[in-house]
Design a protein with these regions (language model features):
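A short alpha-helical cap/connector motif
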Residues: 1-206
Length: 208
């Protein structure tokens, strides 16, 4: 039995795919003659070793989440308060972001891809003493107009690079852009322009 939410997503994707085939710019398609040879990966042992080596730091983040558990339990107020009853920014991700803002107390946060995550970051920043939050998103997935953030309604572009270059140790670069790695796409900009320019000590968040 498929849920209504899952059905809506499938129908939306199908509509966008049909629009793309009809010549409207609603998506990207890349022909690949060896597509039949692609197999589902059974695992990523190299990454598993990286995560295993990071277990002490992961444990520290989990401890920080526990320390701020009472604040996290108070979520789910009316907008623009953060809430857990949404599927865009899952609970563990939100709890970790909230805890790290409290623990590291950044002066600046630059976020690409905004909405429910912004509500959590703004709440944590207000509780921790304030941080300047800049958001870059042409269409945030949740209303953030009432939050104390600066919103640039556009896809990540070259004009945004100085904002990341200005981040210092302890600040946060929060990247939740599209998932399309094409020359000139926002992911291309993030991986090949933003990341190499980050100062040592900047906290980096890469979401899904």
């Amino acid at each position: 039995m498929i849920s209504r939410t899952a059905m809506r997503r499938r129908l939306r994707r199908a509509a966008m795919g049909l629009s793309t085939l009809a010549g409207r710019p609603r998506g990207l398609f890349s022909p690949y003659r060896h597509a039949a040879g692609i197999v589902r990966p059974r695992g990523y042992p190299e990454l598993e070793r990286v995560f295993a080596a990071a277990e002490p730091e992961i444990a520290r983040v989990l401890d920080a989440i526990e320390r701020h558990g009472a604040r996290l339990a108070a979520f789910d107020g009316p907008p623009p308060a953060p809430r857990w009853s949404q599927s865009w920014f899952p609970r563990l991700d939100g709890a970790a972001a909230h805890a790290l803002v409290h623990e590291r107390r950044p002066r600046r946060i630059v976020e690409v891809g905004s909405g429910h995550s912004t509500r959590i970051l703004a709440r944590a920043a207000a509780e921790a003493g304030g941080a300047e939050i800049t958001c870059i998103d042409p269409a945030p997935r949740a209303d953030i107009a009432a939050l104390p953030v600066t919103l640039h309604r556009r896809v990540l572009c070259e004009a945004d690079l100085p904002r990341f270059a200005a981040l210092e140790a302890g600040d946060i670069a929060f990247l939740d852009s599209s998932h399309l790695l094409w020359p000139g796409s926002d992911v291309d900009m993030a991986l090949n322009r933003v990341l190499p320019a980050l100062a040592p000590g900047v906290l980096l968040h890469l979401h899904d």
